[in-house]
């Protein structure tokens, strides 16, 4: 197997944020706020940025908007950190189109969520990813999040896909440390295994994961960077100490479907307007006090 992406794989580590897509109250993408968030994340030490993933509301952006956000994102980052662009779809041709757009924009890697809703078989998943890999020559990351997609990329399927040299990583958002550990044991020398679950990410790092693609890092980028920088050095005592101080935030960011709570939090922090797109709605009032208390305890709001 070719190693032409070996150097790039070493960049896929540490604290990576699945950044929200800021929107105005009318639902339009708020590009000035997006630029500010990107700058803040980089200043706070985030190692890698993910554009228009699940947290970035990829499902409710039009194809043109999706492409426009990726182009803006890459241009504004301007090489300061790697950019991973969410380009997954449950239609293989659409995923190929979005991945081609990400490559044209200059993104460093494409993040490809498993096709949702139409429930492909394992062979269908293999053929889907194979087609994208062959159609667009750029680093690609598998994304397994069965809680959202209702399909689970089996380890055997990942092992087959690891034969493609541009399939460089997998984001494992199953929330199962055991599942992640099995992946690392079988494939850790071939592809980069990243956590996609804030609550279990540090534990998975102990077993050889290289980093975490995070929702919570939207609001505490410095703390998350500190956690995973320490973990990469093998200093799990420091990592756990910082992690424990922000662990309550992980739960709060999922009191309703993400990115509802994290957008509410960023709005309370003055970082974004109160904008989200249907069918997602603003955080239910019954959770406001709970989330506010958590933000206050973390020193994020007065």
UniProtKB/Swiss-Prot annotation:
Pathway: Amino-acid biosynthesis; L-lysine biosynthesis via DAP pathway; (S)-tetrahydrodipicolinate from L-aspartate: step 3/4. Its main location: cytoplasm. It catalyses: L-aspartate 4-semialdehyde + pyruvate = (2S,4S)-4-hydroxy-2,3,4,5-tetrahydrodipicolinate + H2O + H(+). Transmembrane segments: none annotated. Keywords: Amino-acid biosynthesis, Cytoplasm, Diaminopimelate biosynthesis, Lyase, Lysine biosynthesis, Schiff base. GO terms for biological process: diaminopimelate biosynthetic process; lysine biosynthetic process via diaminopimelate. One of its GO terms (cellular component) is cytosol. It comes from the Bacteria. It is found in: Cytoplasm. InterPro entries: Aldolase_TIM, DapA, DapA-like, Schiff_base-form_aldolases_AS. It is an enzyme of class 4 (lyase). Its EC number is 4.3.3.7. Pyruvate binds at residues 55, 213. It holds the Pfam family DHDPS. GO terms for molecular function: 4-hydroxy-tetrahydrodipicolinate synthase activity. The active site is at residues 143, 171. The record marks 54, 117 as: Part of a proton relay during catalysis. Belongs to the DapA family. PANTHER family: 4-HYDROXY-2-OXOGLUTARATE ALDOLASE, MITOCHONDRIAL, DIHYDRODIPICOLINATE SYNTHASE. Homotetramer; dimer of dimers. Catalyzes the condensation of (S)-aspartate-beta-semialdehyde [(S)-ASA] and pyruvate to 4-hydroxy-tetrahydrodipicolinate (HTPA). This is 4-hydroxy-tetrahydrodipicolinate synthase.
